[in-house]
Amino acid sequence: MQYQFDGERERRAEFAMPKRTKQMGGIEQRLRIFVEDYVYTYLYQYGKSGGGAEKLAALVGKYYELEGQRVLLISGAIQAKGTVQEGGTERFGDETWEYIGGQLQQYFKGMTVVGWVHCQPGFGAFLTAKDEQFHREYFKEDWQVLFAMDTVDRLDSFYLYNEDGSGLRQARGYFVYYDRNREMQEYMLDNSMIRPREEAAEIETAAEQPKEGAK
């Protein structure tokens, strides 16, 4: 089954490249990939949680074509819940896709699924034949990407379709960009890997109150 969500691509003249960025690796000319810092940080927290088990997630954002330049802006990540085991590895099931669609509407309106994450702590950030097969089945757009992660050795890499669309290849690099990104902040509070939202809110409130004896 092919899953589609609204807002698959945009061509907007008013779009501007992120200004505050950190380059990771080389520059990928075929597709400029920008991942927001809150997303990047959250994915590492998510990957390390639960005893370092294998995890999947969806990447959400927008795709742009501007003056011949193809740009992928990744502004959010959604945990993959209700995954299924296929051939000894985790995969999105029908329940997973339904959950992602609901979270997309709740937290990331106007965005679409632009790729997915496969985190296998301690196994590197390599592309496997099973990952490529899954990607080609469910992520058919030539701008949809796979982000492979190893949170133990802190290794990661993006994979994208090659020029003729016959398979995936490793991206030469990507950019981490910095933004206020309220959508991802809200998602992180409700899906914290560190502490529940209520506890985080209590700590934040306490920090804002004046200390006894303070002038």
Could you say what each language-model-derived stretch is?
Residues M1-V113, G122-K215:
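Conserved beta-strand-loop surface patch within small alpha/beta domains used
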